[in-house]
Amino acid sequence: MAVVRTINGDVSPDTLGVVNAHDHLIRVGAGEVYIDPDHLLDDVDKAAREATYFVEASKSWAAGGTIIDMCPASSGRGVLKTLQVVEKVPGLQVVQATGFHQQKVYLEWRQSWVNQYTVTQIADLLIADIVEGIDRFDYMGPIVERTNVKAGVIKWATAYGKITEWEKKSGQAVAIASKETGCPINTHVTAGTCGPEQARFLVDQGVDPV
């Protein structure tokens, strides 16, 4: 039977209500915030207020709503804060991502763990996010401390007009993690480019397109 892995556990797909398939509730730091400080989203009360608007609007069609928080690994995930948001908003469910943003978001990408680890090692970390629990430090290292919050979707993002070598490596790991766990992949394009190329890449890696 199909399940959706939310931050509070697995649920049936028919309980999701209205689904916001790509949003950001909490972002506590990392590359995007250094690029543009307006990307900082670390206020639980403000996030809860925004999420409440969504849930209330969703009630025109369903009992509640689900937000897919697409902040991936080492990109400012603050899953313990996200849990607090859900506690404050009745009718809200959240699915948290693992995976990767595009290369440029990782400002020190040459020294990033994606650059230094093997594809298998990277995939193992994504799999652990899904089956064990997301690292409370968001793989900003060196210590890893698993939470009870498990990832329910794998993000893979690519650059403008091309898929870089770094992104091909992250994409290989994303594909392995998806095949091993059955967790779906949600891709992110830049300015509308490389969608077909992403699909071809993932299918070539053995990901089921259905």
Go through each PLM region and give its residues.
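Glycine-rich phosphate-binding "P-loop"
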Residues: 33-43, 156-162, 185-187
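Catalytic pocket-lining loop regions of alpha/beta-barrel enzymes
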Residues: 175, 179-210
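Active-site gating/metal-coordination segments in enzymes
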Residues: 84, 88, 93-184
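Active-site beta-loop-alpha junctions enriched in small/polar residues
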Residues: 24-26, 72-73, 97-103, 159, ...
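Distinct, well-ordered alpha-helical segments
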Residues: 82, 109, 165-169, 193-206
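Alpha-helical scaffold segments that flank or form the walls of functional sites
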Residues: 16-28, 34-93, 118-149
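Short secondary-structure boundary/capping elements
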Residues: 42-49, 163-170, 194
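N-terminal basic/disordered segments at the start of proteins
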Residues: 2-23
